[in-house]
Amino acid sequence: MTEQESPAVISGAARSAGSAGSAASAGSAGSAGSAGSAGSAGSAGSAGSAASVANDRTEQDADAIVVGAGPAGSAAAFYLAQAGLDVLLLEKAAFPREKVCGDGLTPRAVKCLAKMGVPTSENDGWLRNKGLRIIGSGVRIEVPWPELSNYPGYGLVHTRLGFDEAVARTAERAGARLLERTAVTGPVLDERSGRIVGVTAVRQDGSTPREERARVYRARLVIAADGNSSRLSVAMGLRKRDDRPMGVAVRTYYTSPRHDDDYLEAWLDLWDGDRLLPGYGWIFGVGDGTSNVGLGLLNTSDAFQNTDYRALLGRWLAGMPRDWGFTEENRTQPVRGAALPMGFNRTPHYTRGMLLVGDAGGMVNPFNGEGIAYAMEAGEIAAEVIAQALTKRSAAASERLLLGYPQILRNAYGGYYTLGRVFVRAIGHPELMKFATRHGLPHPVVMRFAMKLLANLTEPRGGDAADRVINALSKMAPGA
């Protein structure tokens, strides 16, 4: 690629969403690393003097800083390290740490883990599943994961307590410098350009007074992977979009004989009194003697703001067979909740030296509430863009590549997320939801199509009629 080429050119290498980062590792890893070292931390794209910067650099300086070691941040750090870059991965908690999640992983997420080499054997605490069992309107149907050339034919379940650490340690083994108990408190901005050139953070080691532990970490580029609230994004002036869907999920764990179920189970009949709610309940066996049980709802219903979700979960579970074990005495954890930021609800995904990935950029799939796969894919794409940008000899050429990052994301997910927003609005109408479950669930062909659409699992080229229809609709829909 020449210095004058458009940043959109790299989208071909970055896309085919599951193979997002081929160019990151291919993008001249050695030269990417040296170019990263060559640039002054305070000047986003200047070539500078490699020797001077190398001599001046401290352990608190890096080519790139990633804020947050969830799936998005750890994936980004992994691919940055693989590209030969010096990357700091800052995590406010200490592993292992808890996150609210259903713990179920589709084949799309499994592919991301396999690509990084994350160990996922049963001995490491991972439980395989065959597909999705859907229950609604008196119908019960099992839909296996589709057989596709570009995805594995199985899903996984693993608690987030262990999942996030497994991915973060994989990034660490690749060369990322992981700093736990390091809470980022704000951006460091260049006074002249307003660009982010680092972050301030507090090391929560408990050994000295708080004010003496505040430190400055500097880098040419920063990735915000700090979750739904993304304080770093807010400090940089980015707010959530009100025209994007939002979900909420609550979950807990029970000891249960269903802990080793080889299907993920989704219940579509979520009633609050006489109101059918837009969302679903889930029962995912974890394989360790417990099941993850929870529910997720969308903000397209009038009930969104005035529903007690914990009470709703209790009422739903009260109707389950008692021998499944979902009783108060078998509950092993508190009921916890979290927001699900969907369909690119915070934009732009690049501004003044900062790239957004995962929940910080609102990358949850509106169709099914899945966030991990898209977080990890976006982390890979962001790393690829950074690795290529840091090889450029001029600030202008580097910036052109970085400015192309949001368009790469729109090309990959924009049309599909637009379809998802239409879907979210539609199921906000109870009568339409009833019609869809009553007339769709009894038909296996319809449900196989729905599985591919909702999980975003298709052959990228060719495939069956369902693949071609879904791919065509995603391409025709305007970008998110």
Question: What is the predicted role of each segment?
Answer:
Residues 78-101:
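Glycine-rich FAD pyrophosphate-binding loop
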Residues 94-116:
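Conserved N-terminal glycine-rich FAD pyrophosphate-binding loop of Rossmann-like flavoproteins
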Residues 125, 301-385, 391:
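FAD/FMN-dependent oxidoreductases across multiple families
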